[in-house]
Amino acid sequence: MLTNIKHGKIDLSCIADGGFKPYKDGKIWSDELNRAFKTYREIFIPAGRYYVDRSLIVPSDTKIYADEHAEIILIKGVKTLLLRNESVIDGSDYKIPDDAPCDENISVCGGVWGEENEERLGYGVSGRFDENDTFHGVSTCFLFSGVRGLTLKNLVFRAAAGFACQLGRTDGFTIENIRFENCFADGLHVNGGVKNGTVKNLSGHTEDDLIALNAYDWDNSSINFGAIENLTVEGVNCGDGQNVHKSFRIQPGIYPYKNGEKEDCRITNLTVKNVSGVTTFKMYLQTPAYTDVPEKEIGVGRIENVTFEHISADTTAPVDKQPNYLSGNPVTGNFATFEIGSNVKNIRFSDVAVRLNKEKYPNSYFMTVGPKSQYIEEKHLELFDPYVSCAAENIRYKDVRINGQIADDLEKDIKIVEFGKLYPSSLPFGKGKAVCIRREK
């Protein structure tokens, strides 16, 4: 039973020590935590270990403060996610109305939030919305979808088998000082309908994108499709070590709903600064791998008004260890620090330092523009989208350095990709173009 209630606040150290289900070196806290989140505006979780055997639900007007030595752990074998907000709606099949219910004013600050996992388990296996996998696009430890006013600060995510934190349909947010420890998929996975926010100081070990801004995404990776607007991302540092994936994804697209409506999953007004340890910024459309033709007709998306400042990238080897990149295939083996396979307008680079190994990989560049392909002939399987045609317009740069040398003419380090007929296909193969590249003084 909860005791010592004062002014809408509770310290969990006041909970009577009885009635808990034992687990390993501690106890199962699911009921007590959910009761506290539902009943009190402010909850303090002191240092200690808190095991959880089902999802924690956070309603509006809830502030959770956890001691830095508090560990809230989803126990092994639980298929559902660790924590989510209350008013989640699945927007996979139909557009969510603008006036759909949202939660408001949620904060989670401090603590270690983790799982007892040792590998990525796969979509629908861990991080589910519920036991029945009702919202199949949810695959995460934390989910915030349908929130106005969100704060996440000073958190550690540990051993997440799916995404560490999945975000969608959120307006007005601050995410700051987040560390990932041995997380096996994406770190921060941002989907559509997200606007007016700041992300600051992300670091650590993830085995897929450290941060993904996926306005368009696969059906097994999102329940929110739509624009990402007015976002600043500052202070991103990919960790080192075995299996760390050093990528930052920025993915727009045109998403088709079941009723025939289409969603412009654009990304506009984005500033990215103070980034290190990243190999590649993935700014291209990538649909699920397919044979013959993609499962859905996904349109090429648009990115407008994006700035990269104070970036340090090591692209001396491809981030994706596919055979065509490693072998230097002259047609499909091009890779770059900035890989564009979307329609990009108004992109600016300032104080960007890139390392390339042109001796080993002469097909490596500062930027590529155009389609990508990795075709596995014996399976007739395509991993990328070679039919993409796109353009990068109004590219401005200042103080760009490649292998320590100032780039006076960046156009020489931009590869325009154009595919002829790579293999038998009913789809036309794509091409890229770059328009108006100029150096600022």
Predicted features by range, described:
Residues M1-K441:
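Extracellular/periplasmic carbohydrate-active domains that bind, remodel
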